[in-house]
Each structure stands twice: as C-alpha cells, then as structure tokens.
Amino acid sequence: MAEPPVIRRVAVALFEGFTVLDVYGPVQAFASARLARPDGSIQRLFEIVTVAEKAGPIKSGEGPTTHADHAFADAPAYDVLLVPGGFGTRQAVNNAPLLLALIAASRRAAITTTVCTGSALLARTGIMDGRPATSNKVAWDWVVQQGPRVKWQRQARWVDDGDLVTSSGVSAGIDMALSVVARLQGMDV
C-alpha cells in the first residue's frame, strides 16, 4: 500500500494594498495540486491559510477584501510562507510591526516565497541580505533600494535559492508557485 501524501500548509501574508493576482494566482496553483486516489477521490496536497497583523478583513489594492484567517502570532504551523506585492508595499516597508512579524513568519516556514514587490518587504528586514532574489521590473529601482545588500537578479522570472524563492511581477508568481509544488510534491502532481 502506498504511503498517504504529505499535506503541506501555505500561509499567505496579507497587508493593506496587496495585489489580488499576487495572492490568488499562486493560491490557485497550490490549491490545484491534487492527487487522484485509487478509489476515484481527489486528495488536495496543500492547505491554504491567510495571515496578517491581526485576523479580519484586509483590503486589496484593487478593492476586494480578503479575510485574514489568523494573526501572524496565532497562525497554525505551515510549510510555505507566501508574501505578495502590491502598491501597499510602499507603506508596508515602514510598518515595523509587520516587518518583525514577517521575520518571525519566515523563520517558521521551510520555504519563504515572494511575488512582485513582496520581495521589498523581506529585503527591508535584512533576511535576504547576501542572497539572490528578483522582483517586479517596473518597480525595480524602488525595490532594490529596500535591500541594497541583496544579490538582485533583474532578468530572472523567479529565483530559487533553496528556502527562499522570489518571483518577478504578478503572473510570474504562478510559475514560481508551480515550481514549489513540483519540488514539494513531485512533477507528476
């Protein structure tokens, strides 16, 4: 009998002004990773939770609100942390409690991922210093100012540095998430 699949948990960090596609593109990639069982049923391989400074509604940059399931401090254990970008990052880089929460959240995760300008938030914390990373090309100059000691890779669609995987703008987050799915659950998924 085959061993049951390992169900992984993804924690999606939310903040005011996040970009909807930065969150829901990768979420769809993780949520679509499923395994067909011999009895015909389908087993999801990733569980998705949302986290923020405090649980409750978080308004995106495009307008729709997403509910944060947990405050960072109260989140259940997770394997992957996803940090989206968005115009809200311009204010969030100066939000010390959020940055401290992201440092702690990243330490809890086996893999920390960023989409678009989400890399600016982690760069601002210093946890990406000396590591290769990428980000949104339109906001490139602003992003690299947030972490001058990061080894920025401008041409990359995404950069996989083991426990840190960063992607460039918006839809590149889907490709990045699919690469993490393949790493954690195999190419056949």
Predicted regions and their residues:
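Extended, subdomain-level signal for the structured scaffold at the beginning of enzyme domains
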Residues: 1-112, 120-124, 141-144, 153-155, ...
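Short, surface-exposed amphipathic charged segments that create phosphate/polyanion-binding patches used
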Residues: 64-66, 148, 167-168
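Short active-site oxyanion
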Residues: 107-111, 127-132, 163
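Structural detector of well-ordered beta-strand residues that form the stable sheet scaffold
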Residues: 112-113, 134, 153, 165
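Short, glycine-/small-residue-rich phosphate/pyrophosphate-handling segment
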Residues: 127-145
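Crotonase-fold acyl-CoA enzyme core
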Residues: 149-150, 155-162
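Conserved anion/nucleotide-ligand pocket segment
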Residues: 160-189
